């Protein structure tokens, strides 16, 4: 008998576990989501540039642009998070993503709204505004870590899916420490780019099965 029952499987586990049909998804949609992820990452970098121009150079209009662009990026990121949740559930039979995904969206929206309603001067001095903002950042980081852990528990995923989850985990931990929340933007931006690659890989898989 030539077959060795203890040998490693010779098939691609991701491909082997793929569902035969994903009626709510198409290569075109997944490619579009991938490009939107890249746009979201570019938008986040643009927000940082406008914040610098407004807070450090003193251009008031740049601060206004940063606030509204930040809101647009947050809304786009929320949509993409929900689409990633749906894709992970359909493609990899992921479970337990609902609560952490919605809490990440809620924490992000509350943080963005507070940044738009409270002045920079209020956030820069000790007071309830600073305390509330720091509390939001800790909570935002905590639920981001929770989401990342749930993503890491998903089985038979693309390698870039794992990279995305680890970057999200690192960013969430750094955000929750408050002291490292500015540096946390780097791994979080990386996770957005990795999310784009997840969608692009999904599009290639679906196109190959067609």
What are these regions (language model features)?
Residues 21-207:
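Hydrophobic, aromatic-enriched alpha-helical segments typical of multi-pass transmembrane helices
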Residues 1-28, 204-210:
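Low-complexity, intrinsically disordered extramembrane tails and loops of integral membrane proteins
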């Amino acid at each position: 008998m030539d077959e060795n029952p203890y040998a490693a499987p010779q098939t691609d586990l991701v491909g082997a576990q793929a569902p035969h049909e994903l009626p709510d998804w198409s290569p075109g949609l997944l490619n579009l989501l991938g490009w939107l992820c890249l746009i979201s990452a570019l938008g986040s970098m643009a927000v940082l540039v406008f914040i610098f121009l407004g807070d450090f150079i003193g251009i008031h209009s740049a601060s206004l642009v940063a606030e509204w662009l930040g809101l647009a990026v947050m809304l786009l990121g929320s949509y993409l998070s929900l689409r990633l949740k749906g894709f992970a559930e359909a493609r990899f039979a992921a479970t337990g993503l609902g609560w952490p995904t919605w809490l990440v969206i809620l924490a992000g929206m509350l943080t963005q709204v507070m940044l738009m309603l409270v002045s920079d001067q209020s956030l820069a001095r000790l007071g309830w505004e600073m305390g509330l903002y720091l509390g939001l950042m800790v909570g935002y980081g905590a639920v981001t870590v929770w989401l990342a852990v749930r993503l890491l528990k998903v089985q038979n995923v693309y390698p870039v899916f794992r990279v995305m989850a680890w970057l999200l985990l690192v960013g969430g931990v750094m955000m929750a420490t408050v002291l490292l929340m500015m540096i946390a933007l780097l791994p979080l931006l990386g996770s957005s780019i990795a999310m784009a690659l997840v969608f692009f890989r999904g599009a290639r898989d679906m196109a190959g099965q067609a």
